[in-house]
C-alpha cells in the first residue's frame, strides 16, 4: 500500500478513509499531483479565500493548508479523511473549513481548485455556485482523469464562468484553466437545473434529487426491484442505509403510519434529497423520521433498530471496491438486536450471499431476476 506522496514540492503521508490494513488503493491520484506541481510552480499572487472542491482524501487541503482553505465536498468520508490526514501530517485541522456542497461559497475567492469527476451534474452545480462569487481576478484551475474531461466538460466552464483551456495530459491526468468573465452582479441570471424532479410511477409522489445523487432523473432498477419486494410485515424502527434520495424509506412511511425511519448516507446531497422528499410528499410523517450524514452506522446504538434496508454502493469516489458493502453488513450485524433483519439488494455477481453468511450465518433469497438479488439475513 502506497501512503507517501513524495514530490519536489511536498511530502505527505496519506490514507484512505476508513483506514484499512491491506488497502490496495492509494489516497491520491495523478490529478492531485498535477495540481500540486502546477500550484507550486505558479504560486498564488493575491489575497482572498481559497476554495477546494471535491478533494478526495485531503491531499489538496494538506498541500494548501497554509492558505486556510475552504474545502467543499459532498462526501462525509472525504471530510473525515481530510481531517485524519491533516492530523497524520502534523497540520492543524482547525485551520481549514469543511463545507458541504450545498452551502454558499465565500465571496471573491482568489483561487478555486476543483477535482473533476466523471459525473458532470455535480460539476455543473458547483460551477453555478461559483458563478455567484467568482470575479475576473479569481484563478480557477481544475484537474481530472484525461478520459473524464470532454468537450462537454469544457463547455460547462465556459457557460458558467468564462474562457477555458486545457493542458497537455500528464500521467493520464489533465488540467483545466478557466478565466471568469465579469463580476457576479454583472452576469445574467441562469436557471438552476437542480434539484431534478420526477414522478414515482404508481404513486402520486414527486421525487427530488440533488445533483450528486445516483440516478437523478428516474428510479434506478435496483431500487425498483427492492420496492417491488419490500417486507410485508413492517418493523417498528427501520434504517434506510445508503439511502440516496430516500425512496425506500419514503415508501415505508407512505404505507405504515407507525414505522419510524432513519435515513443515512455519506452524501450530504443524498440526505438532503431524502429530507426534501419526505417534506414534499409526506410532511405529516416528518416526526417519524431522522436524517443522518454518516459513515455507515458509526455511532448508532446497538439494538436501536429492528430492520435495515440497504442498496450498497460498490465504488468509493471512482474506485471500485467492496469494502463499503462489507462495512455496511458488519455494522448492521453489530447494531441489530437478536431477530433483527438486514435486507439488501445487489447485482447477482457481487456475491453478497456469502458475505452475509459469514457474518450472520444465514442468508435467504427473497427475490431474484436476471440482474439483481434481494437477500435477507437475520441476527441470531
From Swiss-Prot:
Gene Ontology terms for molecular function = 23S rRNA (guanine(1835)-N(2))-methyltransferase activity; nucleic acid binding
Entry-linked Pfam families: MTS
Subcellular localization is given as:
Cytoplasm
Kindly provide the name given to this protein in its UniProt entry. Ribosomal RNA large subunit methyltransferase G
**Its family?**
Belongs to the methyltransferase superfamily. RlmG family.
According to its UniProt entry, the function of this protein is described as: Specifically methylates the guanine in position 1835 (m2G1835) of 23S rRNA.
The EC number on file is 2.1.1.174
One term under GO cellular component: cytoplasm
**EC class (word):** transferase
Coiled coil start-end: none
| Highest taxon above the source species | Bacteria
Q: Reaction catalysed by this chain?
A: guanosine(1835) in 23S rRNA + S-adenosyl-L-methionine = N(2)-methylguanosine(1835) in 23S rRNA + S-adenosyl-L-homocysteine + H(+)
UniProt keyword Calcium, yes or no: no
Sorted alphabetically, the keyword list is: Cytoplasm, Methyltransferase, rRNA processing, S-adenosyl-L-methionine, Transferase
